[in-house]
Structure formats: structure tokens, C-alpha cells
């Protein structure tokens, strides 16, 4: 470590020991907090009263909180001074009410997810109030809380560099502490195919192993079996994390096309390309076999994941290098009366989205504007109204908000300038390569992300939420993934959960310190944001 980093880490420990402020570790900050008089004094004979069998996991998590903070785990029973309850009168699916008074602690929620989030908030209260926690006391408070946005996501990219199941579980453990409720898994790209498809085994036999010199499970090689993914889905669901699979088509498909060359455009059938490197190849829109294979893939993916959502890509398709040069695709274009090969995206996704709908899946696509030929003022093709779109291109989110509002599409915000966590966090920091001219996305820049874009509520009611994306070209293991995610992920968690009127950089900066210390204790790597310590307090 260099000297500024060492000093910052020492400061974390000092602040973690000295913290006295009752609310100093709440992150994301709750939307209604009422501090009250008095304290609840614990005894080692406390029990956790659980009012529903659905709350057993939340109760087990609360036992672990007490074990870590107070040194003992209360037994779970039908009643006690510590109570977890479902309350059907509460409105939001993730709403919770945490009440601490001299008589005890109660956590209520309409669903198990809300109660679970109440447990997490209680843990952060204890983390922030070190002096009272050490004496077995909890200050009185009432917190009524619910998220600003229902969709709060992070994205991992095991297609570029494979991440073992246990590593993904650890990532889920951390993200759920900050009330992210969705993990998107980018399971296919030019560099690898990472999900077992039994009807087309070559996808993994060939497409999951780009480096014959490396071991079967390595950053270059590997895939998830369907049973592994089902178990991962269950693990995540207990922690209120929905896993959305992404199969990226018709571009980003070198792994598919290496496994099944007959799916390429006709003029590329005999061409060679290097599997494992970004290659501007595409599935053919004119080949019926493409749609048969994709139908099988969508069916099997839908059977593995409990989510009724599937992300089907749709981004960065090099149409002019593929369909525009393909006799069969140009003939298809003419047969539909189209004047541009871009319009074949309507044909392609018309069939692919029909497969998703057939299997009861709601499709998500990256929002592509006609930005190959600037200005970017319209959709690349005609998105159906029942498709959710994700805005991602640098600087184009305001236009995407406008277009989706007009077209009636739901929109997820993942603007590159705020939420691309593969971008470096500081000058000369990771990733080591910057051959794309990646801009800096600092911690403060991410925190300044305002999902409302200062629009009136009626102009943004179609916005579902936010997503931080971690593209994997330079992410070779989970330690690097965590390093690039945190602390920016903490800033994004507040953008997705906390109302803008309650957000403050100065407040966040103070609440950041005990949470970084907690990440350190849990063995989660993160970048030390030493630069913010020079800011005026």
C-alpha cells in the first residue's frame, strides 16, 4: 500500500471504534427516520418471536447479527421481546417498519423481503452505535422505509471471465446488505458461453472453453450446470435477490458461432476467426435454424431460472459488417420491403421475442439508438411496447427516457457515465488497460447520479430503477469484481433506494466509513477512496 492508502485504512479503524452517531452507518439511508427517547437493554435470555414460517430465514439472519454484535444468538420461539412479523396492511412489497423502544424490538413487513431488510437496517444501527452496542443497548428509534425504485440491480459478466458459483454467492451476500434486489448474469458473449443447454451440448463443450492450455475451471474456461444455477437461484431468493439471465443476441455471439458455425451469415460460413476475442460476427436473421436453436435456449433458460424475466441483449450488433454483406439477409430485407438491413432487427426480434412470450418470459433489451449515424434521435428498430429497455450508452439516457415515455416502454437506468463499474475509479487506477479510452467514473460521480433527471413524476413514472454494470474484460476474479464494485456500489444503492430530497454527499461520505470497515472485516475487497479525505468537512 502507498502512504495515503495506509493512512486511510488506519482512519477507517479509528472511526469504526469511535463512531457514536446512532444513524452513522445507515446505507442506503432510510426514507423516514424518527429518533426517540430511551434505550432497549438486552439480556442474554432474549428470544426472537417469529409470527410466520416465511420469516425463518430473516430470523436466522437476525441470530447471526446478535452473535456478531453482542456475542450471543437468541433462540427463535413463538414470542419474545424481539419480534418479526408480517403485516398485510403495509403497502409495499419491500416496505418495512423497524421500532425500538424500552420494551423491545419489532420488525414488520408485508412480505418476508421487507422483514429481511429491516434486519439489515437493525444491523447497521448496531454497527454505527458502537458505544451502546458494546454495552448491550439499542437506542430507541422508529424507521418506516420503502425503496424509491422497485428495481435495484448489479450485473456480473462471467462470459468474459468465468466466476465460480461460490464466488457469485459471495457477491450476492454483499449486495443484499445494501438492498440491491436483482443480479443480472451476462451468460454469453464472444468470449464464452456459460450455461448448460442440454439440447445443444456444443454450446458448452466448445463455447465454454476458449483456452485449451488452461484448466477446465479458470477465468477463461468453465460453465454453470443447470443444477448449479437452480441452487444459486434459491440461494439468492432467500436474500431477496432475483437473478435475471442474459443471453446476448444477435451480436456478441462468437462463442455460439464457434460451437455451431452453420448459424453464421452465409458469406462467413467458411471464414475463420479467433474464438475468445471480440469479433463483430452475428447470427443470421435469414436462417430458420437460428430461431430453432434460440427457441430451445430460451425454453431451457426459462426452466432453470425462477425469474419470469430474460435479457436478450440486442446491443452493438455490427449489422453493416454482417447482414449488409449477406446475400440471404439482403434478400430477406427486400422481401419485407425494407430499405436498410438495420430493419431486419424487427424480423429477428419479432421471432425471438415470440419465443420468450411462448414460455411466459418478459423480455429485456439494451436500448439502442440509431447512433451509428449521429445524431442519435430515434430507436435503432421498433421495440415492442411490452419489452423493458435498459439505457446504457454514455450521455444518451435523457433521450432514452424521452423515447421510452413516448413509446410506452418500461426503462431501467444504467447510464455509462454513472454506473459502468468496469470504468476506472481514479486516474491511473485499475483496469490496467484502457484501450477504449474509458472515462473515469469516480465515487462522487456515481453518488451524483440522479435517477429522476429532475423530471416531474409524471414524466418519469415509467422508470423502474437503476443498474450498475460490471463488464468482465478486465475482471478476472471475484476480488477484482468487488474492487471495481465497491465503494461505488454503495453510492448506487442510495440512488436506487433513497429519495433524492434525503440524499447528501457529505452525509454519505460520513456513513461510508463504518461500512468500508465492515466490508474489510467480511473479507470483501474494495478500492480505498483516499481522495475524498482531502475534501473539506
Q: What annotation goes with each model-predicted range?
A:
Residues 1-25:
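Bacterial Sec-dependent N-terminal signal peptides
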Residues 20-149, 480, 496-507, 511-524, ...:
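Contiguous, structured surface segment used for ligand recognition
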Residues 72, 180, 239-241, 361, ...:
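Short glycine/serine/threonine/alanine-rich loop segments
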Residues 91-311, 355, 467-472:
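Feature activates predominantly on carbohydrate-active enzymes
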Residues 187-191, 247-253, 316-318, 367-371, ...:
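Active-site-proximal loop/turn and secondary-structure-junction residues that shape catalytic pockets
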Residues 256-261, 272-388, 392-408:
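Active-site neighborhood of glycoside hydrolase catalytic domains
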Residues 363-370, 377-537:
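Flexible, acidic glycine-rich loops studded with aromatic residues
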Amino acid at each position: 500500500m502507498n502512504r495515503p492508502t495506509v493512512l486511510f485504512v488506519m482512519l477507517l479503524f479509528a472511526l469504526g471504534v469511535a463512531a457514536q452517531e446512532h444513524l452513522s452507518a445507515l446505507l442506503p439511508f432510510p426514507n423516514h427516520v424518527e429518533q426517540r427517547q430511551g434505550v432497549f437493554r438486552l439480556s442474554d435470555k432474549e428470544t426472537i418471536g417469529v409470527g410466520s414460517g416465511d420469516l425463518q430465514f430473516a430470523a436466522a439472519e437476525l441470530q447471526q447479527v446478535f452473535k456478531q454484535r453482542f456475542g450471543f444468538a437468541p433462540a427463535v420461539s413463538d414470542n419474545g421481546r424481539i419480534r418479526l412479523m408480517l403485516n398485510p396492511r403495509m403497502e409495499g412489497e419491500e416496505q418495512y417498519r423497524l421500532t425500538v423502544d424500552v420494551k423491545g424490538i419489532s420488525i414488520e413487513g408485508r412480505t418476508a423481503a421487507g422483514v429481511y431488510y429491516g434486519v439489515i437496517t437493525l444491523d447497521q444501527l448496531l454497527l454505527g452505535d458502537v458505544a451502546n452496542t458494546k454495552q448491550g443497548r439499542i437506542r430507541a428509534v422508529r424507521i418506516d422505509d420503502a425503496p424509491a425504485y422497485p428495481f435495484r440491480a448489479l450485473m456480473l459478466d462471467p462470459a468474459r471471465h468465468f466466476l465460480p458459483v461460490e464466488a457469485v454467492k459471495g457477491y450476492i451476500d454483499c449486495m443484499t446488505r445494501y438492498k440491491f434486489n436483482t443480479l443480472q448474469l451476462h451468460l454469453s458473449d464472444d468470449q464464452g458461453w456459460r450455461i448448460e443447454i442440454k439440447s445443444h451440448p456444443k454450446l458448452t463443450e466448445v463455447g465454454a472453453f476458449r483456452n485449451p492450455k488452461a484448466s477446465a475451471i479458470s477465468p477463461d474456461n468453465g460453465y454453470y450446470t443447470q443444477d448449479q444455477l437452480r441452487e444459486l437461484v434459491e440461494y439468492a431468493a432467500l436474500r431477496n435477490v432475483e437473478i435475471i439471465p442474459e443471453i446476448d443476441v444477435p451480436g456478441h455471439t462468437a462463442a455460439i458461432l464457434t460451437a455451431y458455425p452453420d448459424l453464421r451469415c452465409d458469406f462467413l460460413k467458411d471464414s475463420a476467426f479467433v474464438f475468445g476475442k471480440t469479433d463483430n460476427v452475428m447470427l443470421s436473421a435469414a436462417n430458420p435454424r437460428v430461431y430453432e436453436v434460440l427457441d430451445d435456449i430460451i425454453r431451457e433458460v426459462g426452466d432453470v431460472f425462477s425469474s419470469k424475466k430474460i435479457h436478450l441483449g440486442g446491443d452493438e450488433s455490427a449489422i453493416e459488417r454482417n447482414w449488409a454483406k449477406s446475400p440471404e439477409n439482403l434478400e430477406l430485407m427486400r422481401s419485407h420491403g425494407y430499405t436498410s438491413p438495420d430493419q431486419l432487427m424487427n424480423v429477428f426480434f419479432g421471432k425471438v421475442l415470440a419465443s420468450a412470450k411462448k414460455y411466459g418470459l418478459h423480455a429485456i433489451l439494451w436500448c439502442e439508438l440509431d447512433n451509428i449515424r449521429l445524431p442519435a434521435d430515434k430507436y435503432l428498430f421498433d421495440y415492442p411496447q411490452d419489452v423493458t429497455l435498459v439505457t446504457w450508452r454514455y450521455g444518451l439516457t435523457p433521450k432514452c427516457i424521452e423515447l421510452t415515455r413516448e413509446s410506452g416502454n418500461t426503462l431501467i437506468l444504467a447510464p455509462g457515465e454513472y454506473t459502468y463499474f468496469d470504468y476506472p475509479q481514479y486516474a491511473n487506477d485499475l483496469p490496467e488497460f484502457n484501450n477504449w479510452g474509458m472515462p473515469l467514473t469516480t465515487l462522487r460521480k456515481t453518488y451524483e447520479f440522479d435517477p429522476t433527471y429532475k423530471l416531474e413524476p409524471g414524466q418519469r413514472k415509467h422508470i423502474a430503477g437503476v443498474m450498475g454494470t460490471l463488464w468482465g474484460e478486465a475482471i478476472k476474479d471475484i476480488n477484482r469484481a468487488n474492487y471495481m464494485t465497491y465503494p461505488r456500489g454503495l453510492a448506487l444503492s442510495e440512488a436506487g433506494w433513497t429519495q433524492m430530497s434525503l440524499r447528501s454527499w457529505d452525509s454519505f461520505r460520513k456513513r461510508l466509513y463504518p461500512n468500508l470497515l465492515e466490508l474489510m472485516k467480511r473479507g470483501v475487497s474494495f478500492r480505498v477512496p483516499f481522495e475524498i479525505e482531502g475534501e473539506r468537512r
